[in-house]
Amino acid sequence: MPLLDSFTVDHTRMNAPAVRIAKSMVTPKGDTITVFDLRFCVPNKEILSERGIHTLEHLFAGFMREHLNGDSVEIIDISPMGCRTGFYMSLIGAPTESIVADSWLAAMQDVLKVAVQSDIPELNEYQCGTFEMHSLEQAQEIARNIIASGINVNRNDDLSLSEEILKGL
């Protein structure tokens, strides 16, 4: 099985909250697609709550689009990581980490403005596979923690696992 890019970085050295360009590629038509690692928690030390990350999934995708989409950027998808330490965001364009971080902080401010659980988008059995597994309170606690901590940048060069280490794993 091929080694995926996300497993070639040392998770023991990742900072959180932090933005990392996980991958960048150019399509045959010349569009740049960038995948960002939006790391909310320090891997293997913290984890996002099940209900909190699910609620963030519903809120974060819309709020990030409001703050980041523009003439040169269009978000394709924002999805939670299986390890529950953050989200991957795929987009057309190549915004800087600082622009993404600013949009992320603004989106977290928006999460805090959601007044009641019933304001969570797509919170029904028709549009959500586990519509009862949500917590606005937990999502807002996550948002408060991100805002209080600020957002750093993780760089692949600083986190890259050597070929020797990868062969030994």
From Swiss-Prot:
Single GO BP term: quorum sensing
GO molecular function terms noted in the UniProt entry: iron ion binding; S-ribosylhomocysteine lyase activity
Isomerase recorded as keyword: no
EC number(s) reported in the record: 4.4.1.21
Disulphide bridges, residue numbers: none
Gene3D superfamilies: S-ribosylhomocysteinase (LuxS) (3.30.1360.80)
Cofactor descriptive note: Binds 1 Fe cation per subunit.
Keywords: Autoinducer synthesis, Iron, Lyase, Metal-binding, Quorum sensing
Pfam families: LuxS
Reaction(s) the record says it catalyses: S-(5-deoxy-D-ribos-5-yl)-L-homocysteine = (S)-4,5-dihydroxypentane-2,3-dione + L-homocysteine
HAMAP family (UniProt xref): LuxS
Official protein name in the record: S-ribosylhomocysteine lyase
Species name: Shewanella halifaxensis (strain HAW-EB4)
